[in-house]
């Protein structure tokens, strides 16, 4: 059998759909939880607090939140030098390897030398970057903080002290997964390193999941108003549902219907736990695809489309996992 490998030329061919921002892994939307995160970090910078940590359960959207936070800080506070860092020390076998990894992450070309040389080079690089940026503040965003070790905290303390000698303030923002990050802090207390907790992790806050009606309304409105491509394109929703759009359909008007479906599809505790970003975005993509396919096939609008999409996203299972994690966390207290 001969297979035609040429992509279809329809407006919503698979190739074009995959390239749409709705499906791109790098698309990050300024949601209400992320806006709250930015406001808290903004205050942290203004009052010159040395650090804080945010925690959340699996699937809430921690990494995406830090990506958007980095973007917002760079745009709104250009005088602040922002350095993102992903902790993966369970795979780093030595502190020397850690320094090499960090140097590579900030673009330093020379990864040779002994541990002391690498450490000195890394600290001087951070100082030079701050000076070049004419920045009085270095904001270090640490993802996967639940993988940090005591050596990492000691390194942060060294960096803080060295930058302070040059009149530069280091502020660390850690994002870690619960209950694992709690184990990290418990180990610091067990080892008597309250100085490290005091400097970097005394202020512990929650990066919350989607839970408020305005969270969903703001997110859905973003889908209604974002244009792709930027010049002469369609709104994201219009791209998938042109006929429904012409008849006045708007995703923001679906919030009540969506929340009713959440109540039907998930456990009663779902509203209090919140909806993880991972499951929410899977459900939205699934919903838009299903309505698009139905529209193209001249089928009736799927009135229970949200029920099917939430079931596909396995929302109930994700919330059950969060509940189990919270029970485990409570037992440790």
Q: In which residue ranges do the predicted regions lie?
A:
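C-terminal alpha-helical "lid" subdomain
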Residues: 2-9, 16, 22-30, 51, ...
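Pre-Walker A adenine-sensing motif
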Residues: 32-49
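Conserved catalytic network of the ASCE P-loop NTPase/AAA+ motor domain
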Residues: 43-47, 74-78, 130-134, 147-150, ...
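Short hydrophobic/aromatic beta-strand immediately N-terminal to the Walker A/P-loop
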Residues: 51-56, 141
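Conserved lysine of the Walker
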Residues: 62
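AAA+/P-loop NTPase substrate/partner-engagement loops
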Residues: 72-106
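The catalytic "switch" region of P-loop NTPases
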Residues: 82-91, 138, 162-254
